[in-house]
């Protein structure tokens, strides 16, 4: 009961690129779906890596269910993100040139991985997501983001992600020395809007 490592690629090859964008899809989505979003981002010179969740979902239940109820899939999903990062590092890409983009379940997974492995990255965009668990276990989160730019966009209300968890996540990342911008859109629905793409480009992919 674990994810098979299956990384889809697009953009520049790892050999050519100096920067890498890791894109994490949402529940029921696919690596190809989220890679197609890259055409709207300022990432023409990046290598794009998108791991595919086995069975289309990173973990079975809500991200605010008790953590043990999402195991062993959750730990395997976090490990998959780590292996995707290692793929970039092994190609000679520095961590400060590795970027992240996640939507919904993929945003939650991206944020959970980053908070557990804080260091200076290129930047991160998380649309409708927060750190994972029914309660936030602050002991899991260590490191220093060294002012890594992070953009959190969400809708309020959102059926899957309470806005309170987005704010709590922003506060944790700020405590860990990330440069966080959060933007809440009233009644926008569970999707990515045009302004979020523009903000992602101006804050992170600049």
Can you annotate each of these PLM segments?
Residues 2-97:
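Serine-hydrolase catalytic machinery in alpha/beta-hydrolase-like enzymes
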Residues 34-37, 138, 162-172:
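Short alpha-helix in the alpha/beta-hydrolase fold that links the catalytic acid
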Residues 101-106, 110:
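Gly/Ala-rich beta-loop-alpha elbow adjacent to hydrolase catalytic centers
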């Amino acid at each position: 009961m674990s994810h098979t490592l299956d990384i889809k690629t697009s953009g520049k090859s790892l050999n050519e690129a100096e920067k890498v964008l890791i894109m994490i899809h949402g529940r029921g989505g696919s690596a190809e779906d989220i890679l197609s979003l890259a055409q709207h981002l300022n990432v023409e010179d990046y290598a794009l890596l998108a791991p595919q969740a086995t069975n289309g979902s990173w973990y079975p239940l809500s991200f605010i269910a008790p953590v043990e109820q999402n195991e062993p899939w959750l730990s395997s999903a976090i490990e998959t993100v780590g292996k995707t990062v290692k793929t970039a590092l092994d190609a000679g890409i520095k961590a400060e040139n590795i970027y992240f983009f996640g939507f919904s379940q993929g945003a939650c997974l991206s944020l959970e991985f980053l908070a557990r492995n804080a260091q200076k990255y290129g930047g991160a965009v998380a649309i409708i997501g927060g750190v994972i668990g029914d309660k936030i276990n602050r002991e899991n989160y260590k490191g220093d983001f060294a002012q890594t730019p992070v953009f959190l966009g969400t809708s309020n209300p959102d059926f899957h992600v309470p806005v309170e968890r987005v704010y709590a996540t922003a506060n944790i990342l700020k405590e860990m020395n990330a440069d966080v911008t959060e933007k809440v859109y009233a009644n926008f629905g569970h999707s990515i809007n045009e302004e979020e793409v523009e903000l992602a480009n101006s804050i992170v992919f600049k």
